[in-house]
Design a protein with these regions (language model features):
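Short, flexible hinge/linker loops that cap or flank conserved catalytic cores
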Residues: 37-39
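Phosphate-binding active sites in nucleotide-utilizing proteins
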Residues: 43-104, 111-116
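Short, surface-exposed amphipathic charged segments that create phosphate/polyanion-binding patches used
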Residues: 1, 86-90, 163-165
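A generic secondary-structure signal marking the coil-to-beta-strand transition
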Residues: 41-44, 147
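Cysteine-nucleophile active-site neighborhood
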Residues: 96-167
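Internal gly/pro-rich beta-alpha loop/helix module
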Residues: 1-35
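Glycine-rich, charged/polar anion/phosphate-binding loops
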Residues: 24-33, 73-78, 135
Length: 167
């Protein structure tokens, strides 16, 4: 690990949290016209969690709860729509390509997410969650399946695993 892990850089990145601007919310509100929820506001963060979306850092979810978010889990595979009380969506990593056919078959969920995006709901998709937000995704069977259509594009299978690393 000593030869491949830059501990000093990781510590510097961790210190960035302590160096927040005094009022980043105000800048974002002016830029987007959206008021960010305050700690006392109830903000329901709907988090996709099932066989297709299963990679989350628990400390991130705990940090969001500490900032006032109420985390509510839902399943893009098994539920018909996002939770009605959702104020924002988090679609984490996982293996949507392994479940592409089943995700595509759940048209009511895909429509629910597309409509939420169209209304301006904050949505964060990372890794597999981002792939689910695309127009279509190539499944493990190499067929192409419709996804949510929030972003234009097609997720395709590569010949090998991509690189992973720090910021």
């Amino acid at each position: 690990l000593e030869t491949t892990l830059d501990v000093e850089q990781l510590l510097k990145l961790a210190e960035l949290e302590e160096m927040r601007q005094e009022s980043p919310d105000k800048d974002l509100e002016q830029e987007t016209g959206r008021r960010l929820p305050k700690k006392q506001d109830k903000f329901c963060l709907a988090v996709a969690k099932d066989e297709a979306f299963c990679f989350y850092y628990q400390e991130n979810l705990r940090a969001m709860e500490a900032e006032g978010a109420v985390v509510q889990y839902f399943s893009p595979l098994h539920d018909k729509a996002i939770p009605e009380e959702a104020d924002g969506l988090l679609l984490g990593g996982g293996y949507p390509e392994l479940y592409a056919k089943k995700l595509a078959e759940n048209e009511t969920m895909r429509t629910s997410i597309f409509q939420a995006a169209k209304r301006g709901m904050p949505i964060h998709g990372e890794c597999g969650g981002y792939l689910y937000l695309l127009e279509q995704l190539q499944g493990e069977d190499e067929a192409y399946y419709p996804m949510c259509g929030v972003f234009s594009g097609t997720g395709i299978k590569g010949k090998r695993l991509g690189n992973f690393g720090y910021i």
